[in-house]
Amino acid sequence: MSRADFHQQQAEQATREAQRLLAQQATLGPRWLGWVASELYQLSPPEYAAMVRRELQRLTSPD
């Protein structure tokens, strides 16, 4: 499977996962960053984890 195919197939799921992680920010407060890091570490394959990480950056960066 090509990188483009993988990205296309996983993009929606990566966005949902990033939104799920971001939704916990208010609940976890200052512990959120460490929690997110451990959640990202558990994602597989690494290419998918990178997609979720990029989506988190997009969702949290000011416009």
Spell out what each predicted region is.
Residues 31-61:
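Short, charge-rich amphipathic interface segments used for partner binding and complex assembly
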